[in-house]
Each structure stands twice: as C-alpha cells, then as structure tokens.
C-alpha cells in the first residue's frame, strides 16, 4: 500500500527556520511539498521551491493555485540552482535530504525494495541508472559503494553475490536486487530489511547526493541574507558529517582573553555562520512511532551573521 508522504521533523524545522511575514524562503527539496506548504501556512511569507524530479510538478502546481504569487517552483537540482535563481537572496533556506514517499512507494520509480519495479533510482530520470551500475560495476566497486554510502558491513558478500547472479541473468528489477541482498546476509529478527542499506547506498551514488550537497553548501552564502537561517535535515551519517563540518568550518568561535573577561568573537568575514543547534536534533520517539522513516533523521541549523 502506498503511504501518504509525511514530512519529517516538521515542527522542529519551522522552529529552526522561524518564518516571518513578508520574508522569502527557499525550499531546496520540494518533494511532496510538505515543507513548502507548512512555511506558507505559518505566516504571510513567500516560498521558492526546487526539485529535479519532474514528477512533482503537478503537486507544485496545486500549491501554486492555493497560494498564488507567494509560491514559485523551479525544476532543478539544488546544486545547480544558483544560475536559475540569479541574484535572488533568501531570509531562510531549508533542505530535506530524504527521499519522499512519492519516490519510495511508486514501483516504477525503482527506489523501493518493498515494491518490485524497474531498477532505476534516478531522481531526474537522467544519467546512470541503478540497473546500469549494478550490472556493469566490478565487485570491488560495488562493495566500496555499498560500504561507503550504506554503512553495510556485509558489502563484500553482497557484491560477490551480485556478480555471481549477473552470470546467469541481468539484474533489472528492484525485486531481483532485494532478493540477492537478502539471500546474501539473511533476515535478522527485529532488524530492518537487509536490503535497506544497499538500496540507500546505490541511490546516493547514482544521484551523486553527497557531491550535490557539498557543491550547494560551498555556494549557499551567495543566496542567504544576513540573519537568514539555513536548516538541513539529513538521514545518513555521511550527509550529517558534511553539514556538521561545514557549519563548524564557517562559524565564529569565542576567544577567551582572560579568565575574568567574557568570551569575545573574532571578526572574520569568512566565518559567516552562527550555529543555532549546538548538536543535531532528532525526531521524538512519538514521531518515529508514527513514521518509521524518521528514525535516522537529524536536523542542524545555523544563521548568517555576515553577507
């Protein structure tokens, strides 16, 4: 059964973003529109939404009908959005790095190990597909990708099984790949589906999700106004590490002049962020109980103190 999309950590996102009337916000990962709609409903503000998935355009049009000129949609990946946004700046920017239910639950999109469909996994429908990668990559490359992007300790065993299977038939469906992974490591009672980490790893690799995130963060200063807030919700340790390190590297640190003096801030325009969340925020147990996909989510936020 296809689930309706539930936005993860919605209230904590709104609290961190703190939308205000008359201000403009950028939703970098529109998906089903949960964040955009919540921001628009929070006050009389403006939202520009981005997504490289052409399948979300219909949903964007529905929101535009309800909110008129307060909402604008641009079909693009967020790393490549700077040229399309031109010189526009925003009072707040939010990124939800998870995959929406619209993608996971529709078999034809090829993301889900629960719904058999063509092995695709491409957000935009362009570039290398999961099928092409899985059937062409050597065992070492497969194992490296599954380990690096999926934290899968059985990556070599899975890669070996994939290569063995390819000798008899092409791996062209999500169902085939899921069964190959499951047969490699087996089910463990009470644990997540054995295919979870492998599917995550291949999806991240095929869509260059980490590279896109890094490229966006390098340039985000150019589109965030002074006092504007940057909120990122991640679902993978590598994503969270990238965001954490970016915030740390670009934030000012207090300098103690003496034990009697208060902390003072160095003035360095390259240190242009102030971290709002001292540590990553996690969803409540209640939210995870209602939406299991929220279990690995982490939210970090920072504010621009210089332009």
Swiss-Prot record:
GO molecular function: rRNA (cytosine-N4-)-methyltransferase activity
Keywords: Cytoplasm, Methyltransferase, rRNA processing, S-adenosyl-L-methionine, Transferase
Residues where S-adenosyl-L-methionine binds: 33-35, 51, 82, 96, 103
Keyword Cytoplasm: yes
Catalysed reaction, written as an equation: cytidine(1402) in 16S rRNA + S-adenosyl-L-methionine = N(4)-methylcytidine(1402) in 16S rRNA + S-adenosyl-L-homocysteine + H(+)
EC annotation from Swiss-Prot or TrEMBL: 2.1.1.199
Pfam families associated with the record: Methyltransf_5
Intracellular or extracellular location(s): Cytoplasm
Any one of the GO BP annotations: rRNA base methylation
Top class in the EC scheme: transferase
InterPro entries in alphabetical order: RsmH, SAM-dep_MeTrfase_MraW_recog, SAM-dependent_MTases_sf
Keyword S-adenosyl-L-methionine: yes
Signal peptide positions on this chain: none
GO cellular component, one term: cytoplasm
Its biological purpose: Specifically methylates the N4 position of cytidine in position 1402 (C1402) of 16S rRNA.
Family: Belongs to the methyltransferase superfamily. RsmH family.
Protein's recorded name: Ribosomal RNA small subunit methyltransferase H
Source species: Rickettsia peacockii (strain Rustic)
Gene: rsmH
């Amino acid at each position: 059964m296809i689930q309706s999309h539930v936005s993860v950590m919605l209230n904590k996102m709104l609290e961190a973003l703190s939308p205000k009337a008359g201000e403009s916000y950028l939703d970098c990962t529109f998906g089903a529109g949960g964040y955009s709609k919540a921001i628009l409903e929070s006050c009389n503000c403006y939202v520009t939404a981005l997504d490289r998935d052409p399948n979300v355009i219909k949903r964007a049009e529905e929101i535009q009908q309800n909110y008129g000129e307060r909402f604008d949609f641009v079909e693009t990946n967020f790393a490549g959005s700077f040229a399309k946004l031109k010189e526009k700046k925003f009072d707040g920017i939010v990124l939800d790095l998870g995959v929406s239910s619209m993608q996971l639950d529709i078999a034809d999109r090829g993301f889900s190990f629960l719904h058999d469909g063509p092995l695709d996994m491409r957000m935009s429908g362009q570039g290398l597909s999961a099928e092409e990668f899985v059937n062409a990559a050597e065992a070492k490359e497969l194992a490296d990708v599954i380990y690096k992007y999926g934290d899968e300790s059985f990556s070599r065993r899975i890669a070996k099984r994939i290569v063995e299977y390819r000798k008899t038939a092409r791996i062209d469906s999500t169902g085939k790949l899921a069964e190959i992974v499951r047969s490699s490591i087996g089910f463990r009672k009470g644990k997540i589906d054995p295919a979870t980490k492998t599917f995550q790893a291949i999806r991240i690799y095929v869509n260059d999700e980490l590279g896109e995130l890094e490229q966006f963060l390098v340039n985000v200063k150019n589109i965030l106004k002074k006092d504007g807030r940057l909120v990122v919700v991640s679902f993978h340790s590598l994503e969270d590490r990238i965001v954490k390190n970016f915030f740390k590297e670009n934030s000012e640190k207090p300098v103690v002049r003496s034990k009697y003096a208060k902390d003072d801030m160095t003035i360095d325009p390259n240190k242009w962020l102030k971290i709002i969340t001292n540590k990553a925020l996690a969803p409540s147990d209640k939210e995870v109980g209602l939406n299991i996909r929220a279990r690995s989510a982490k939210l970090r936020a920072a504010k621009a103190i210089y332009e």
